Amino acid sequence: MKTIKFRILRLVCLLSITGGAAAAQVVPPTWTAQDALGRTIGTDAQYGKPRPGKTVGMFFVVWHGAHGYDHYEARPDMDVIVPGKNDTLSPYDIQKLLDERPDAPQYGPVGAFHHWGEPYLGYYVANDEWVIRKHAQMLSDAGVDVIIIDMTNEVIYLPIVTKLMEVYRKMRSEGNRTPQISCVFHTLLPNGKETLKKMYDNIYSKGLYEELWFRWQGKPLVFCPREALTPEMDAFFTTRHCWFDSREPWFRDGQRCCPWADYYPQNYGWDEDPNVAEMMSVAPATHPTDRRDRVQRIGRSFHNGRQPLTEAEQRSGEGLHFNEQFSRAMEVDPDFLFFTGWNEWSAMRFINQGEILTLANNECKIGDSYFCDDYNHEYSRDIEPLRGGFGDNYYYQLCDFIRRYKGVEPIEVHSDIHRIDPGDMTTWQQVKAVYADDRGDTFHRDHFGYGRIGQLINTTGRNDIVEAKMANDGKTLWFYVRTDRPITSCTDPKWMRLFIDVKGSGLPDWEGFQYAVGNPAADESKTALSRSRNGWNWEKIADLDYRVSDNEMVVAVPFAAIGVKNPKNFTVDFKWIDNAVDQGDIQQCLSDGDAAPNGRFRYRYIFEQQPDKTR
């Protein structure tokens, strides 16, 4: 082990480095990632240049906590209900019930909502601001343009939707990104048209949150048949009829239609020309049941025309059906992809009266229980990360799909050599390799959860990273990071760690990173450089000097220490993590502390030295 030093000359305040320079923008399409299966998300070299006119929508649910907990309950305002003292059993997690008693799961009461699994963010309710913020961030990072709020059950959940829009507005005022908003209605139900009218009367006609409305063909888009509109609404909205299964009569010839889910190979909806695809759905799965009038049991492992019916055969975490549906969408190449969905998470328990033939892998007899839309890890269609099971696989598969569909801007290639003075922050002013992170994503959580869960608290947000920079002087990589407020003490646990992936190294790694800085923790003048011995097993190989000044931090890592063999041409991915990741669980970057960039993503620095033309 060796000690690597740099000399500290002087300290300069933050004002000197920012001195009028435009703030860097958060640009997720330039980030890279590696998921738990080793699948990579790359850059424009993998996906090609941007394809203008491609739009992504995501089916989005806001019913969590609005229909009671241990028992079904409906209130006139359809707001989230505060759990009562008698809510001692829910959430009913079907996957856990099956794991405990596969042949006789102990379901909750008839009519009660049951979860198919546990969200990574916990069993939440829909008005938890911390969750709303996390969802907006994850969806924006993925490239989702619009969430399509489910109002197909004749309920608009007005207090919850209003809370969501208020949070989105607040996030935007803070400089952060959110998707736009649209809604989907089932106007063929008895009160379906009235549901649409309520949303129009309460939000659209009043011009509320207009900056959040998603527009298509110049007008706010809602998913419902045009004939459901009054003349006033018809002049106001663009509409697309939206329901399940393009083989059903509602779809007609497909004009101005868009299924929220469909069987492979999916059909597309069109607007003026039947030969021009406008919209198409893509889903990880459809339903857990076969009905007397249709075969619809399609789980996450369905592919090549077959649903595996034993757990040994099922590959729920690989996204086989999801990939098949997306491949079909890329063949057709519509202007709008409708992904179903993000966060349904639960379904009501019903008793079979003879209409259902199978539930999941088993026969469903008269008098047996069944669940319409979701059941367990295999028979569910949410993309939001799961706790346990397949984790965040579907989220990063979504990110990959959207980049394939939209293309991405070319990532910048750097050629400048910079002489960095670690004591003079003004030397960073000319550095062009600048990477931004969301401001305010250390927001603390303190909100009641679902049913018996109690208060969900997360106060791990600490150092809010807002900007990173990287430079090299021909022998050393220099890393700079800036936080929103003064950086906390180095004695804090899991403090300001930097992870480095030298592309092409071939060395053992943790989540693709061969090296870590600050793992173990630093003292006030030195920090450890460690290398992975395979996974979260680190060996210290050197000490590095580093410097913290108020809300800025600089650390230097020599090429030789991390195996950069060609100083004129190399690529490095890197990631800052503060107060997250215990025992190697990188998914904690979705929920704890702060990571720059978010989740599993990492920044990429490409260096290609230009030839000296003076010689």
Language model: regions and residue ranges:
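Glycan-processing catalytic domains of CAZymes
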Residues: 25-418, 424, 432, 487, ...
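Acidic, glycine-anchored loop motifs typical of Ca2+
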Residues: 418-452, 506
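Short, well-ordered beta-strand segments enriched in hydrophobic/aromatic residues
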Residues: 423, 475-485, 552-559
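Short coil-to-beta strand junction motifs in C2/discoidin
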Residues: 490-497
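Acidic/polar low-complexity flexible segments
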Residues: 412-429, 499-522, 561-615
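Beta-strand-rich interaction surfaces with strong enrichment in secreted/lumenal proteins
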Residues: 466-469, 541-546
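N-terminal secretory signal peptides that target proteins for export/translocation
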Residues: 1-6
